[in-house]
Structure formats: C-alpha cells, structure tokens
Design a protein with these regions (language model features):
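Helical "substrate-binding/catalytic lid" subdomain
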Residues: 1-76, 80
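Long, low-complexity C-terminal extensions of enzymes
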Residues: 54-58, 64-116
Length: 116
C-alpha cells in the first residue's frame, strides 16, 4: 500500500506542474529503481541524499511547498511534502549507516529536512 501512495503522490506532483501523462514519465524511472533495489538492495540508493547534496534537498522541499500552496491552498496535498521528509530522513539514515555520506553531512541534511 505504501508504494501505491508514493507513486500516486509523484503522479499528482507531475500533474500539478502540467505533465498530463505522469504514468508515462514515471514508468521507466520506477521500473529501473525497483529492479535496482531488488538486485542491489541499499546499494541502489542514488540521488541528492546519497551525494550529500543538501542544496538540492532544500530546493526540493521549497518547490514542494510552493506547489502545494499554489495548487491546494486548503492543504489537501500536504501529504506529499510530509512523505518526502519522512523518506529523506530514512534515506539519510541508511546512507550514513552505509558510509555513503559522513555524519557531518547527515546532520546538515537532517537540519534541512526537519528545521524545527
């Protein structure tokens, strides 16, 4: 069930920025990510967190906040940013444990993910 929620959140986000056929965009990305995860486990982790790219994670959160406020002022899509934060937190932890990022970089990421 969690995978369905995650995929539909990604589809809603893409629809919000004007991509009508979000499934067509996501299908190859999701297929490749799932295949790598099944074959490589946590070794398949890529992206800004595994690179320690704090600025990109911050930009993602700012963009999600802007999109959510512009599209749904009633907060209907607030779950998307909450999911991003939860998954970013978990990914940071896994990357630190697997020595993909240093403890110092992990702390910087945690400060961006959970600024309060």
């Amino acid at each position: 069930n969690h995978l369905v929620t995650l995929v539909t959140q990604a589809m809603r986000t893409l629809n919000t920025i004007g991509i009508e056929d979000a499934a067509a965009v996501l299908r190859p990305l999701l297929s490749a990510a799932l295949e790598r995860a099944l074959n490589e486990g946590e070794g398949a982790l890529t992206g800004p967190i595994s690179r320690g790219d704090v600025g990109t994670v911050s930009s993602h959160l700012n963009a999600l906040d802007s999109l959510e406020q512009a599209k749904e002022p009633d907060g209907r899509d607030r779950d998307i940013q909450a999911s991003y934060r939860a998954l970013a937190r978990a990914t940071t932890q896994r990357c630190e444990i697997n020595s993909q990022i240093t403890p110092e970089v992990a702390q910087q990421l945690y400060q961006v993910i959970d600024p309060d």
